[in-house]
Amino acid sequence: MEEFKGYFEKSGSIQQHFLYPLLFQEYIYALAHNHGLNVNGSIFYELPEISGYDKKFSSLLVKRLITRVYQQNYLINSVNHSNPNRFVGHNKNFYSQMISEGFAVIVEIPFSLRLVSSLEEKKEIPKSQNLRSIHSIFPFFEDNFSHLNWISDILIPYPDHLEMLVQILQCWIQDVPSLHLLRIFFHEYHNWGNPITSRKSNYYGLSKENPRLFWSLYNPYVVKCESIFNFLRKQSSYLRSTFYGTILERTHFYGKMKPFGVTCANDFQKTLWLFKDPFMHYVRYQGKSILVSKGTHLLMKKWKSYFVNFWQCHFRFWSQPGRIHISQFSKFSFYFLGYLSSVPINPSAVKSQMLESSFLIDIVTKKFETIVPIIPIIGSLSKAKFCNVSGNPISKPVWADLSDSDIIDRFGRICRNLSHYYSGSSKKKSLYRIKYILRLSCARTLARKHKSTVRAFLQRLGSEFLEEFFTEEEKVLSLILPRISYPLHKLYRERIWYLDIIRINNLTNHL
């Protein structure tokens, strides 16, 4: 970060105007390499048949690629695509992914520097900003959901073309060469028929191939989509404060009616009255958001219509109304942050005694519940070959060549991650079933390695060596909350939110 700041200070100009030269700096690719952006190994290793040596990373290939782009202008003006590999030579995926990874690192620099400078100036982040972070979702779930009635489950639509992401990014970064190179990169994949830019799988494929570049482009797009909320909140707040003033201060009632009428004269200001709701809440994580309210079903339908029209008119793409699902909390369960959440109504009767007469009082209570989504998780475990589609554990043959300790460690790490992530669940029965699948799959894998049956293997070694699957989380809880007086098994049934669960992206993204 110090090198980036020094570079921008030498330029003597606005920071985001000079990102393009960073593509030719060695430490950019060393930084991307050290971050381990590719889970299967760094992509910044030059191929032996190209460079003559292995396990080296440099900007030589990037310079060669960019030079070909601008000298030949192959992608834009070429009519004959009979030799699609001509542009990149030996390996088109290697070159293209390499330059895109470097570009993703560079795009993050202005935002990182902005955060660092704000921290240096203010020394402390205001609490109002903290409440808008991802960590504020958990107390919001606990404290607010049980008091609300309606929910809109929203899937933020993707734009029809990647060019729209470039145009939105242009509002943040005014470096023309970098944006032009990004356009060429997208056009390159389009000409080759790469699946990441086909109409149906544009963004899904890009998020899998290059997640860092995907989120660098997608986050400004989401900020743009949500900008309307800030505008409506300010306008609605202004109208609401004016309205309350006219009611409470009766001595100046008629004097304030005139400017109040002028404020609402505009047609759009009148439309805002339809969306005034002091109990409206909006929460988002990545591409999924929820809009909850204590209002009526009519109000939620107006919000839905407004969203669809806003996306179509402002972003020029078709948004299907089915992407916004409206339902009552008591009749609807929704997926968010990897949980299946709901607010069921629990009716109960209380007997009241007054003198010699007694009567029953019907009481309705609502409690926010978070449940482990057992079916999607079993589907994910089935794809990873830990069980079949019915949830029956099977061995993991690809791990049979590892040592016993490595096998147990891998299964234990998966189990601990699941326990850690779903500790906020109000019902742990499904989590116990997932642990059972992993535990028995581990036993089957070890038995397969030693050419034995599971029963004989457990009888010979005992089942204690697998107990860490169930005891690790209890040990952590006993260290965090040592003063709890009631038994630990009751504590483990309590709902506990860990603020670092968003790092386990596979669990938040598989739903």
From Swiss-Prot:
What is this protein's function?
Usually encoded in the trnK tRNA gene intron. Probably assists in splicing its own and other chloroplast group II introns.
Q: Show the stretches that span the lipid bilayer.
A: none
Localization per Swiss-Prot or TrEMBL = Plastid, Chloroplast
Family in the record: Belongs to the intron maturase 2 family. MatK subfamily.
Listed under GO biological process in this entry are: mRNA processing; RNA splicing; tRNA processing
Protein name per its UniProtKB record = Maturase K
This entry's Gene Ontology molecular function terms read: RNA binding
Give the gene that encodes this protein: matK
**Pfam short name (any one):** MatK_N
Q: Does the keyword Secreted apply?
A: no
What GO cellular component is one of the record's annotations?
chloroplast
Question: Which of UniProt's keywords are assigned here?
Answer: Chloroplast, mRNA processing, Plastid, RNA-binding, tRNA processing
Q: What is its main location?
A: plastid
